[in-house]
Design a protein with these regions (language model features):
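Conserved protein kinase catalytic/activation segment
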Residues: 86-89
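A short glycine-rich, hydrophobically flanked beta-strand micro-motif that places a catalytic Asp/Glu
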Residues: 72-84
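Peripheral (often C-terminal) accessory segments that flank ATP-dependent C-N-forming ligase machineries
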Residues: 117-200
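Residues in well-ordered beta-strands of folded domains
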Residues: 1, 12, 80, 137-138
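ATP-dependent carboxylate/phosphate-activation module, predominantly the ATP-grasp catalytic core
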Residues: 1-70, 94-119
Length: 200
């Protein structure tokens, strides 16, 4: 099975109205949703880390492709590292932001700011590869500890959590609603149940 021969990666782009890539992020995915309706959505990823070796050259062919086709706007590219030949295979290109796109904002690069600067203020920007180490997780740390199969990735995610560099876009400190807090507690409990019951 494809699932057993490598690792999944998320690559995000913002391409300007001048058809130039302004921002790239490249993150390794550690976990995905396990319920049938959520398959394909990641629940944990780590930016600035790659257990197969972090190399800026990985994204260069994708950058050239996006500019060659004259792409404009947001894009998310799903990739698979194939350990049989050491190459990254493109699975699909989504012409939008992803559910997990918040990790760019957490790393200091707000995608909407790029859009506004480009379309409203006509700002030209050099291409930036976001290297900031940041983890995005929708699941509690106990799920990360138990179900991330890659030891290097698991250790990196937990290290970032300890350093305060793991974010959950569903959690907002200023939202002190008891109803909201209960919802998030139940969501964590449900994630624990799902990962225990369902196989990926």
């Amino acid at each position: 099975m494809l699932e057993n021969i490598g690792a999944l990666f998320d690559c995000q782009f913002y391409c300007s109205k001048a058809k130039k890539v302004q921002l790239i992020a490249f993150a390794q995915i550690g976990l995905q949703e396990r319920n049938p309706g959520g398959i394909g959505n990641c629940t944990l990823l780590v930016n600035g880390f790659n257990e197969h070796g972090y190399d800026e050259k990985i994204v260069e062919p994708l950058k050239k492709f996006m500019e060659r086709i004259g792409y404009q706007g947001f894009a998310e590219v799903d990739l698979k590292y194939d350990s049989r030949d050491g190459k990254y295979k493109v699975l699909e290109i989504n012409p939008r932001q992803a559910r997990c796109s918040y990790y760019l904002a957490a790393g200091g690069h707000n995608l909407i700011q790029y859009l506004v600067d480009d379309l409203i203020y006509n700002k030209e920007k050099e291409c930036t590869l976001m290297k900031n180490e940041v983890a995005l997780s929708f699941v509690p740390k106990s799920v990360v500890k138990k179900y991330v199969t890659s030891e290097p990735l698991r250790n990196e995610a937990l290290k970032l959590a300890k350093e305060g560099k793991m974010v959950n876009p569903l959690k907002y400190k200023a939202d002190r609603s008891i109803k909201r807090k209960l919802y998030l507690v139940m969501k964590d409990i449900n994630y624990k149940r799902k990962y225990k019951k369902l196989k990926w």
